[in-house]
Structures are given as C-alpha cells and as structure tokens.
Amino acid sequence: MEDFMIEFLSKLQIFISKNITIKRLGIENIKNLCGVDIAYKGNIGYAVSVMFDGKDYFHKYVKGKVDFPYIPGYLFMREAPLMIKAVESFQCDLILVDGHGMAHPRKSGIASVIGVILDKPTIGVAKSKLYGDIVEEGSTNFIVVNGDKVGVKVGKYYYSIGNKVDIDDVVELSRNGYPKVLALADKLSKELKKKE
C-alpha cells in the first residue's frame, strides 16, 4: 500500500473521530439489537447482520469481492462496505460490530466508522487488543486512549464506544456476556463461507 494512501486513510479516520457523538443511550431502552460480522473465503467476504427484537432473531447477508488488503488499524476499508450493506436495512437501536470502536490509534475503528456513516449507536466488540492501556478501577478494566475511557476489557473481549453511546452503556452491555447477536452473525457468516 502506498504511503499517500495510508496518510489519506488516517486523515479520514481522524475526520470520522471528530464526528463521533458520545452520549448516554441506555441499554434498557433498546428494542432492536443488531450484530454484524464478516467471514472470508479468499477475497470474497460474507457479511451477516442479525437483529433481535426482544422475541425473535432475523438475519440478512451480503457477499462481495474484497480487494483491499488487511492492514491493522485500517480494517474499515476492507470490512465496512459489506457490513454496512448487510445491516443498513434493519431498524437497529444499537449495532454491535465485530471489531473496535474508539479503542484505536485514531479513535476511529470500524464500529465508529459504521456508526458515523449510518448515524446510529454502535459498540465495538473485539477478540483482541488493538490499542490503548488497560487501567483497573475496582472490578472494572477500562480501556484508556489518550487519557479517555473508551471501553472495557471483560474476559477475552474488548468492548469500546463506537458512536452515540457512552462508557456506561459499554460497561452495562459488557456485563451480559458475549452478545448472542454477534455469536450468531459469526456462526452464520462462517456457515455461508463453507457452503460456497
């Protein structure tokens, strides 16, 4: 990847980070909870979104060719277009994204990018650490970036603010274990990949 392209993408992420809204959503107010994940077979991506309306689970999927290479910190270029296509037609009160939100070098991981583009509340849920310090306060392990609490580490998962939520929302969501909508999106995306 050319240096000028990386520089441009970094500027784009900084612009997105300046447009993130941090405000209390209230997990208890969510009626439609969505999760989105993606699996790959070669350069074909299989993005699956799952919505839970409090009673039933619904899902949609999109597949497409992905040409952008995997570059840590720039995952959004590879995954966001298909993820957005998979989730945008659901009426989501909160979208959980497999990936980071503000726990990112430019406070603009894929969950934040998707949240700002769709103008929706998002939380990133990742299986590995990308960026930030883990600071223990009582029984809570906060993820801190540039002095700001942007997420929490619970077990092996990293939850972080994407858009239109605050740290209390992230803490509250993280107490309920790994979200079923994400587990289902992960499972279905892998099943789709195997069928092809």
Curated annotation (Swiss-Prot):
One BP annotation, GO: DNA repair
Principal location listed in the UniProt entry: cytoplasm
Reactions accelerated catalytically: Endonucleolytic cleavage at apurinic or apyrimidinic sites to products with a 5'-phosphate
HAMAP family: Endonuclease_5 (MF_00801)
GO cellular component: cytoplasm
Organism: Sulfolobus acidocaldarius (strain ATCC 33909 / DSM 639 / JCM 8929 / NBRC 15157 / NCIMB 11770)
Site (Interaction with target DNA) residue list: 70
EC number: 3.1.21.7
Keyword Ribosomal protein set for record: no
InterPro entries the UniProt entry points to: Endonuclease-V
Binding sites annotated in the UniProt record for Mg(2+): 37, 98
Statement: the UniProt record of this protein carries the keyword Transcription regulation: no
Matching Pfam families: Endonuclease_5
Cofactor: Mg(2+)
Functional summary from the UniProt entry: DNA repair enzyme involved in the repair of deaminated bases. Selectively cleaves double-stranded DNA at the second phosphodiester bond 3' to a deoxyinosine leaving behind the intact lesion on the nicked DNA.
Taxonomy, superkingdom: Archaea
Protein name (Swiss-Prot/TrEMBL): Endonuclease V
Protein family membership: Belongs to the endonuclease V family.
An example Gene Ontology molecular-function term: single-stranded RNA binding
Subcellular compartments: Cytoplasm
